[in-house]
Amino acid sequence: MNEQGFTDDVYERLRGICTAVAVLAGDAAPESTLTGPVAFVSAGRVSVVVDAEAGRRRTIALLQEGDALVLPAGGWPGAPGARVRAATDAELLVLNREIGDVLCSDAGLGAWIVRAMASAVADRELSVAIALEPRLERRLVLKLRQLADRWGKVTPEGVRLDLRVTHQELGDMIGAARESITVALGRLQDQGEIIVRRRTVIIRRMDDQDGTATDTA
């Protein structure tokens, strides 16, 4: 989750203890550069992708500016071959020291890093739970709610998601073909779950209770 408080001050303090890694759109970050316990997206948008069955690609995390990317030693559990790919030109700040050392030298920044890492782990666990849903439309609406909870804006109609992800990117996140996503979005709109306007999606309900998203947002 995008950790609140990713201010210019935090950015400058992170640069003092991190190695900056620039990644061009469409490229993968070299594994040799991702050697710290955690990295932070300081610019652009990146995803963590793995190769799935039948030559498909699966996105297991989508990250934007301020998001933390926990880098487990030996790779991502259950996701062999995972790589960090830039959806746009991006910059990562890879922590080049132990978390404990940061807590000792800058307790405030260390606490911020720990919160950001906890949010990242919680978001990953939610993504895993969504992936286990058997029905495509259910997986899709849960994923849209997850994205809207992180990046959406409350409007009178619901929570507006202006993330500008493509149908292919949504499909990669929940294990579905692009064509299936297009059909599922249409069905969700017919059911009143969402409103689709070009590449903007408005999520009418952020949970399974009756009423629009603005009732609880």
What are these regions (language model features)?
Residues 1-35, 68, 73-76:
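Cyclic nucleotide-binding regulatory module and flanking cytosolic helices
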Residues 21-22, 52-69:
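Short acidic-glycine-tyrosine-enriched beta hairpin
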Residues 22-23, 40, 50, 86, ...:
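Conserved hydrophobic "DFG−1" position in protein kinase catalytic cores
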Residues 35-49, 64-67:
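Glycine- and acidic-residue-biased ligand/ion/polar-headgroup-sensing regions
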Residues 61-122, 126:
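Cyclic-nucleotide recognition modules
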Residues 108-175:
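Polybasic "coupling" helices that flank or enter modular domains
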Residues 149-217:
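Phosphate-/nucleic-acid-contacting segments
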